[in-house]
């Protein structure tokens, strides 16, 4: 981890990729996505001993080889769209490259990779993130809460604004390693403050963000209070909500034909990815089980039609 006295050459990286490729293929059933490392300190594509990241050609070659190392039906995530855009747009490598924003601060910052709202990079993640897993993390709380801006309370990353960004960019997952509970430190970091930040149904509807009818209700029907941390936790990835189940029985000679029709709404931030066969399962009064495989494509379970600025489910 971090920097070392001597770093790998590109040839070292390629040899390592060759070693990893069969292992990744063998274990792809437990892999959602691979994050592109290899270059520099912490694999963050900076500060390499051989200055590899100074060449766009080097970065493109390495990313293409990482994509070839990765199982065909899994994606690779890069830290900023600029790296993906080194690839030809009509290439297989481009189509399988997604995003991992490791500096989510929402508001503009010199180190945010030009990925705050209103930038081409932000818009690219919004457009392309609908079709591939997107991941990210906040900076370390021990860094962002160091009063660098002269704020007596440190630099708290806004929970409600973050929730909106995660929704717009179709986030599948978010690390809780950074800016939550770090290294046993007693300080409160941003995600702890999110737990104290109320979020209302009115706010979510105003921002066209997903919310279920009963999300702000307890089991007894009384009002439930929600906070920004809970909302992010509950809506990362997919959140399938049953709308209607129709069951029609038709008699045909001595047999009965059962027609089933199920309607769902996805109230999450993203659709499902990778392989998820869908079955109807029937259990009779004797606990005998019958499974019926459907032709449902779970990758199409979008929260709303991609590109729809009304975000209608």
Residue ranges of model-derived segments:
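An active-site-proximal structural segment forming one wall of the substrate-binding cleft
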Residues: 6-33, 57-69
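Catalytic-core regions of glycoside hydrolase
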Residues: 33-40, 44, 48-203
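Short coil-to-beta strand junction motifs in C2/discoidin
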Residues: 271-279
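Substrate-binding cleft and catalytic face of glycoside hydrolase catalytic domains
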Residues: 1-9, 35-42
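Proline/serine/threonine-rich low-complexity linkers at boundaries of modular beta-sandwich domains
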Residues: 227-241
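A beta-strand/beta-hairpin structural motif
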Residues: 291-313
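Short amphipathic, basic-aromatic surface patches that mediate peripheral association
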Residues: 264-271
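Aromatic-lined substrate-binding rim segments of carbohydrate-active enzymes
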Residues: 1, 12-13, 74
């Amino acid at each position: 981890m971090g920097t070392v006295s001597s770093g790998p050459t590109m040839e070292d990286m390629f040899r390592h990729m060759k070693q990893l490729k069969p292992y990744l293929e063998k274990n792809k059933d437990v892999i959602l996505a691979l994050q592109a490392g290899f270059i520099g300190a912490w694999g963050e594509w900076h500060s390499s001993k051989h200055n590899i990241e100074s060449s766009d050609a080097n970065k493109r070659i390495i990313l293409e080889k990482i994509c070839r190392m990765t199982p065909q039906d899994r994606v690779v995530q890069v830290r900023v769209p600029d790296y993906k855009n080194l690839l030809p747009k009509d290439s297989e490598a481009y189509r399988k490259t997604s995003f991992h924003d490791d500096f989510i601060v929402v508001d503009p910052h010199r180190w945010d990779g030009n990925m705050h709202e209103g930038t081409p990079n932000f818009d690219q993640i919004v457009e392309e993130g609908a079709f591939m897993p997107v991941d990210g993390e906040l900076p370390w709380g021990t860094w962002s809460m160091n009063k660098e801006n002269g704020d007596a309370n440190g630099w708290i990353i806004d929970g409600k604004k973050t929730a909106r960004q995660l929704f717009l960019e179709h986030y599948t997952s978010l690390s809780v390693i950074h800016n939550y509970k770090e290294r046993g430190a007693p300080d409160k970091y941003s995600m702890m403050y999110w737990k104290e930040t109320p979020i209302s149904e009115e706010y979510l509807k105003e921002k066209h963000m997903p919310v279920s009818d009963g999300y702000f209700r307890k089991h007894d029907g009384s009002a439930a209070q929600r906070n920004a941390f809970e909302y992010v936790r509950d809506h990362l990835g997919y959140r399938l909500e049953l709308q209607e189940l129709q069951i029609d029985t038709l008699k045909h000679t001595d047999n009965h034909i059962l027609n089933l029709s199920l309607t769902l709404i996805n109230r999450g931030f993203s659709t499902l990815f990778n392989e998820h066969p869908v079955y109807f399962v029937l259990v009779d009064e004797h606990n005998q089980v019958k499974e019926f495989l459907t032709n449902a494509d779970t990758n199409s379970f979008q929260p709303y039609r991609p590109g729809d600025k009304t975000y209608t489910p």
